[in-house]
Amino acid sequence: EGKSFPYVFNIGTGCPWTSLFKKSLIDENKLEFMALSRSNDIYFVNMALVLAKRITMLPEVLVNYRQRSTSLQANNTKTPWDWYEALKAIRDKLKELDLYDTVETSFKNLAFGVNIYNLCSLKVGEAFCEIYERLNSEIFAEFELDDFTEEECYSYNGAKYQIYMQMKECSAVEYLFRQAQEMKEWQ
């Protein structure tokens, strides 16, 4: 069962097009996409995983992912908080179903990865700074990530953990300055 698997939220991507779901699972649990412009699939996929009676993974690559400059993900500055709303909805539903404690570490790694990924995927400095500061001032604490340790962090989030540690030390402007300095030294 999904809820008994300790890495349930971390076995794949949050994209529905990389998975097949039984219609009965969707119907029985009244699973729907959220009414969001972006990240509307995060809730659907992750709740389907945790509520599934069985999860089967195939070793073959069946889907190729392409990025385009006109995709919703490429233009996430237009709706920069949708991922946050999706994560809150998952957390709240897990608590409502009394499943949160069972999958807490897996959920924290999901939230951690989604937080940092969405921050780093922004292409507008103002949005980056706004999200960066809000992550540090309230969102990390809201998802119980303000004291997230390297031991809790799953290996696939390793590079994101290094970003997180830098974020805890400085403001958005200082972080960006440090990144510019590192690029200068690299060249």
Which stretches of residues belong to each language-model region?
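Catalytic core of nucleotide-sugar-dependent glycosyltransferases
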Residues: 60-69, 74-101, 114-117, 125-145
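Catalytic-loop motifs flanking and including active-site residues across diverse enzymes
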Residues: 44, 86, 111
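Membrane-interface aromatic/basic loop that binds lipid-linked glycans or pyrophosphate carriers
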Residues: 125-187
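Short, surface-exposed acidic
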Residues: 100-105, 148-152
